[in-house]
């Protein structure tokens, strides 16, 4: 005669502890999702700026070296040499590209953290399901 022990049902405290962990993981996931949305919006803005500045650079390439270029600063137009204007655009493009690289790196890091939290959420949900599921019928 073999003695099979029935599984010990989980206590309400154990289930509550897992639910608390689930809530913490969900909250962390939501924070990461919000950060990803902000980074995505920043990336879109930078891509627009990059496109605009690249178009300006192409326009400068078409100009003669002695062309008159004016820079708008508030309500006043200031005369600029082509070289100064090209240097300004080049430095803007460098800054934008560096910012894009930073955003891409941050996006990947946060996306990885969000996936880890999502996996934890699934893990906790499965634990809760397995603990609260009715026991299988006993074979006789």
UniProtKB/Swiss-Prot annotation:
Which key words are in the record? Chaperone
Molecular-function GO terms, alphabetical? protein-folding chaperone binding; unfolded protein binding
Q: Which PANTHER family has this protein been placed in? A: PREFOLDIN SUBUNIT 6
- Statement: the UniProt record of this protein carries the keyword rRNA-binding: no
**General function of this protein:** Binds specifically to cytosolic chaperonin (c-CPN) and transfers target proteins to it. Binds to nascent polypeptide chain and promotes folding in an environment in which there are many competing pathways for nonnative proteins.
GO BP: chaperone-mediated protein complex assembly; protein folding
The family assignment reads:
Belongs to the prefoldin subunit beta family.
Protein name according to UniProt:
Probable prefoldin subunit 6
Claim: Chaperone is one of the keywords in the record: yes
This protein's GO CC annotations: cytoplasm; prefoldin complex
Q: How does it assemble?
A: Heterohexamer of two PFD-alpha type and four PFD-beta type subunits.
The organism is Dictyostelium discoideum
């Amino acid at each position: 005669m073999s003695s099979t022990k029935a599984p010990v049902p989980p206590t309400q405290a154990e289930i509550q502890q897992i639910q608390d962990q689930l809530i913490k993981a969900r909250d962390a996931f939501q924070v990461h999702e919000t950060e990803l949305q902000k980074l995505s919006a920043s990336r879109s803005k930078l891509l627009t700026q990059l496109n605009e500045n690249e178009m300006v650079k192409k326009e400068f390439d078409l100009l003669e070296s002695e062309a008159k270029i004016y820079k708008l600063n508030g309500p006043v137009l200031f005369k600029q040499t082509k070289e100064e204007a090209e240097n300004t655009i080049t430095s803007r493009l460098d800054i934008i590209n560096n910012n894009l690289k930073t955003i891409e790196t941050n996006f990947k890091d946060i996306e990885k953290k969000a996936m880890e939290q999502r996996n934890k959420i699934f893990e906790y949900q499965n634990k809760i399901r397995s603990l609260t599921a009715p026991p299988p019928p006993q074979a006789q």
